[in-house]
Amino acid sequence: MSETPSKQTAASDETGAVVAPEPGPVSQWLNKQGFDHNILEPDHLGVEQIGVDAAVLPMIAAALKSNGFDYLQCQGGYDEGPGEQLVCFYHLLAMAEQVEAMVADPSAKLREVRIKVFLNREGTPSLPSIYGLFRGADWQERETFDMYGIQFEGHPHPKRLLMPEDWKGWPLRKDYVQPDFYEMQDAY
C-alpha cells in the first residue's frame, strides 16, 4: 500500500500521539479473509473507508460482493491538489440484505463501505475496471476517465463521456489549464 498516504490513516489523541483508526466490521472481515488493505478514518457520516492497491481492487470488490455488498452506489474520483495524488473511490451498499432486514426492523442500519485507490498523477494513472462485477460502473468509470484521466483497464467502452473526443487534458484536475482561456481584468 505504498501509494496510500499516511495522513489518511492516522489521527491524534488528546496527548498528540498518533493513533491508528479502529478497524470497522468490513476491515475486520477482510483481515480474516487475508486481504491486504489500509484502514482509513471513517467519513463525516461514519461510513467505513478502506484503502487498497489498484492491483487488488477487483479481488477485494469481488470478495465484498460475495459478502453481500451487491450495489455500487457511486464511483468517482477527486484530485488532492497539484503535485498530490488522484483518488478513485467506490461506495458499496448491501442492498438485498437491507430490504430483508427492513421487513423485520424498519430502523435496521444499512451496511456500506467506501473503497479508495490512491494513484500517482504522473504518467497515465490506471487501475482495473470493475465493470464485470458491477454494470453500474460503466458510465461512472467513463466519467472519471473523462474528468481526471484515470484509465480503467478492461473497460469495454474506454472513451470520453462528457467532453469531445479531441479535448485536451482533464478538466477537473486542479492543475488543469483551460485552453484558450484568458482571465478578464476588472475595469476598476
Curated annotation (Swiss-Prot):
<dbReference type="GO" id="GO:0008137">
    <property type="term" value="F:NADH dehydrogenase (ubiquinone) activity"/>
</dbReference>
<keyword id="KW-0521">NADP</keyword>
<comment type="subunit">
    <text>NDH-1 can be composed of about 15 different subunits; different subcomplexes with different compositions have been identified which probably have different functions.</text>
</comment>
<dbReference type="Pfam" id="PF00329">
    <property type="entry name" value="Complex1_30kDa"/>
</dbReference>
<keyword id="KW-0472">Membrane</keyword>
<comment type="function">
    <text>NDH-1 shuttles electrons from an unknown electron donor, via FMN and iron-sulfur (Fe-S) centers, to quinones in the respiratory and/or the photosynthetic chain. The immediate electron acceptor for the enzyme in this species is believed to be plastoquinone. Couples the redox reaction to proton translocation, and thus conserves the redox energy in a proton gradient. Cyanobacterial NDH-1 also plays a role in inorganic carbon-concentration.</text>
</comment>
<keyword id="KW-0618">Plastoquinone</keyword>
<keyword id="KW-0874">Quinone</keyword>
<keyword id="KW-0793">Thylakoid</keyword>
<feature type="compositionally biased region" description="Polar residues">
    <location>
        <begin position="1"/>
        <end position="12"/>
    </location>
</feature>
<dbReference type="InterPro" id="IPR037232">
    <property type="entry name" value="NADH_quin_OxRdtase_su_C/D-like"/>
</dbReference>
<dbReference type="GO" id="GO:0048038">
    <property type="term" value="F:quinone binding"/>
</dbReference>
<keyword id="KW-1278">Translocase</keyword>
<dbReference type="InterPro" id="IPR020396">
    <property type="entry name" value="NADH_UbQ_OxRdtase_CS"/>
</dbReference>
<dbReference type="InterPro" id="IPR001268">
    <property type="entry name" value="NADH_UbQ_OxRdtase_30kDa_su"/>
</dbReference>
<feature type="region of interest" description="Disordered">
    <location>
        <begin position="1"/>
        <end position="23"/>
    </location>
</feature>
<protein>
    <recommendedName>
        <fullName>NAD(P)H-quinone oxidoreductase subunit J</fullName>
        <ecNumber>7.1.1.-</ecNumber>
    </recommendedName>
</protein>
<keyword id="KW-0520">NAD</keyword>
<dbReference type="GO" id="GO:0031676">
    <property type="term" value="C:plasma membrane-derived thylakoid membrane"/>
</dbReference>
<dbReference type="InterPro" id="IPR010218">
    <property type="entry name" value="NADH_DH_suC"/>
</dbReference>
<keyword id="KW-0813">Transport</keyword>
<dbReference type="GO" id="GO:0019684">
    <property type="term" value="P:photosynthesis, light reaction"/>
</dbReference>
<comment type="similarity">
    <text>Belongs to the complex I 30 kDa subunit family.</text>
</comment>
